[in-house]
């Protein structure tokens, strides 16, 4: 019973993170020190968009690392979420960055505050 409860608490935490951060990256490590090549490439693509983004280091949050793939229906990390929607992982993000779609998406999600 206890384990099931903690599982639903983790799912609630994931939902809250996704809902409260317009642009959110679940990654291994942090943007300054990514702990895998896929996370590093995704961070680079996001940084090139020139907007701030939130991140969750799944290596320091093993319970999120365990639950998020099932919640997202996406098995791998990193995962980029924009406005509550899963955009995808490294391959998708890199491709979107190359064709300009990523910047368009991020700019639309985070309009300049001036």
For each predicted feature, which ranges?
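Short, Lys/Arg-enriched N-terminal segments with co-localized hydrophobic residues
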Residues: 1-6
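Eukaryotic intrinsically disordered and solvent-exposed regulatory patches
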Residues: 10-12
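Local sequence-structure signature of Cys/Sec-based thiol-disulfide redox active-site neighborhoods
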Residues: 15-52
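Acidic beta-strand-to-loop metal/phosphate-binding motif
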Residues: 26, 79-83
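Thiol-based oxidoreductase modules, predominantly thioredoxin-like and allied folds used
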Residues: 50-66, 75
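A short, glycine- and basic residue-enriched loop/turn
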Residues: 74-77, 90
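Non-catalytic, surface beta->alpha helical segment in thiol-disulfide oxidoreductase systems
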Residues: 82-112
């Amino acid at each position: 019973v206890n384990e099931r409860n903690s599982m639903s608490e983790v799912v609630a935490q994931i939902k809250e993170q996704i809902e409260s951060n317009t642009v959110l990256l679940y990654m291994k490590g942090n943007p300054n020190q990514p702990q895998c090549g896929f996370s590093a490439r995704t961070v680079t693509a996001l940084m090139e968009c020139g907007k701030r983004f939130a991140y969750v280091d799944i290596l320091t949050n093993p319970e999120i690392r365990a639950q998020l793939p099932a919640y997202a229906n996406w098995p791998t990390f990193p995962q980029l979420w924009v406005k509550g929607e899963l955009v995808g992982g490294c391959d998708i993000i890199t491709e979107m960055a190359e064709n300009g779609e990523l910047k368009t998406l991020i700019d639309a999600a985070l309009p300049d505050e001036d």
